[in-house]
A protein has these predicted regions:
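Low-complexity, acidic/Ser/Thr- and charged residue-rich accessory regions of DNA metabolism proteins
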Residues: 2-4, 167-175, 181-183, 187
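Glycine-rich, flexible loop segments associated with nucleotide phosphate handling
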Residues: 72-80, 170-177
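C-terminal functional regions that serve as terminal interaction/effector modules
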Residues: 174-181, 188, 203-204, 208-209, ...
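Charged interaction scaffolds used for protein-protein
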Residues: 2-54, 59-65, 73-76, 81, ...
């Protein structure tokens, strides 16, 4: 029995020692250290992006709208200012860290965050398939049927616009607004708004584009 136990322990130790280490694909290693407030940074860990949700994108968009950031009025997700806010949220570093970053660093951060968000649309016949199973109130979801968006009317749009205003948004072109997409998706599916705002960050562009699909306006 002692020999068997020792063999088991040895096997476990060997397995742990030889198990491949998971590489952090969101660890940005800099070509040269970036000095911020007297401290050198040789890398920036953006793994915290996995903890962000659609709500974080909504908050960032609202902040830029309220700051009257002209570039963010339409395709907010393509702007450097938007990426800065998400990167700060993901890393816990102050926003000034990203504002003062050299362009060589800033562009790499931008590329990594945009790459994270630009997942394949994977939406067919208005069925939006999720990148990973999503759990909400004890139930698992792998796809969302948005076909009923076609049944919404002008009153629904007005109600969604009023909801935007209550949430602190100035109503401009709603087709670019993340919260507006979540509101309409909720109306169409009967799922609460929180279902959509709680989706992982990388689903934000997918839901925005799916709700505004040209097929709904033919």
């Amino acid at each position: 029995m002692a020999e068997e136990k020792n063999m088991t322990v040895a096997t476990e130790e060997k397995t742990e020692a030889t198990a491949p280490k998971t590489e952090n694909q969101y660890l940005l290693k800099l070509n040269r250290p970036y000095v911020f407030e007297g401290k050198e940074y040789a890398e920036i860990d953006l793994a915290g992006l996995d903890k962000l949700t659609v709500q974080d994108a909504i908050n960032a968009q609202r902040q830029l709208f309220n700051e009257r950031e002209p570039a963010a009025m339409l395709l907010c997700e393509t702007t450097t200012a938007f990426v800065r806010i998400l990167a700060a949220k993901a890393t816990g570093l102050p926003i000034e860290f990203f504002k003062l970053a050299p362009r060589s660093v800033s562009r790499r951060i931008y590329g990594m965050v945009m790459g994270y968000m630009n997942v394949d649309s994977n939406t067919e016949n208005h069925i939006m398939r999720l990148e990973k199973p999503y759990y909400f109130e004890g139930k698992q979801y792998t796809e969302i049927d948005l076909n009923s968006v076609a049944d919404l009317n002008s009153l629904n749009e007005s109600a969604a616009e009023n909801r935007l205003t209550r949430a602190g948004f100035m109503v401009t072109d709603t087709s670019y607004n993340y919260l507006y997409a979540c509101i309409l998706a909720g109306m169409a599916t009967g799922l609460p708004e929180e279902f959509f705002t709680g989706l992982p960050l990388y689903e934000v562009l997918k839901i925005k584009n799916a709700v505004n699909d040209a097929g709904f306006f033919e």
